[in-house]
Structures are given as structure tokens and as C-alpha cells.
């Protein structure tokens, strides 16, 4: 999640005008995000484990509805692949694709992550 956040943070700052757009940096950050999002994370939630086994904000629903989690992960992998394909092609291309990544992140966070206390 930290790798996602680091790379998406750079891309979001560029898209919002909080940082200068840099085509090379945007392309690298989007590729990094896609590589991380494309990793098989299923082993992070093995059967028999729970959110009480580690310090985590993961909700129990990750274990009880794992196929839905996998769908959310695929949505992030797909949207980050689309972003990686265009992030270095200009600020407008970045802006046009980053929203789908944000929606993918939000969908998983809304369903599977506890709010900060």
C-alpha cells in the first residue's frame, strides 16, 4: 500500500497542479504503480488468518469475501495499466486517466479498510 501511495501521490500532485508535470517521472511512477498493483497479493490473506493476526486496518470482509477483493485488485491493475500507457504523454493524458485509478482505490478502501481512529 505504501508503494501505491508514494507513486499515486506524485501523479496526483501533478494532475492537481501541486507539482510540475514531468513526463519521465509520471511514466515511471505510473509504471511502478502498475507493477505493484499487478502483483499477486492473495497470499497476504491466507485461509485461517484474520485481521487480528497483524496490526492492520484490513476489515474481516477481506477473508470472508475474497473473490470480491480479487475483483477490486484486478480493477486497480487494469486502471493503473491504462494510466501507465499514457502518463508520460502529457498532463491532459494523465488527468484523463488518473481518476479511474482513484475510483479503484476508493472502491477497495470503502469495502475493506477500517477508518483511521
Protein language model annotation of sequence segments:
Residues 1-23, 27-117:
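Sequence context surrounding c-type heme c attachment/ligation sites in exported
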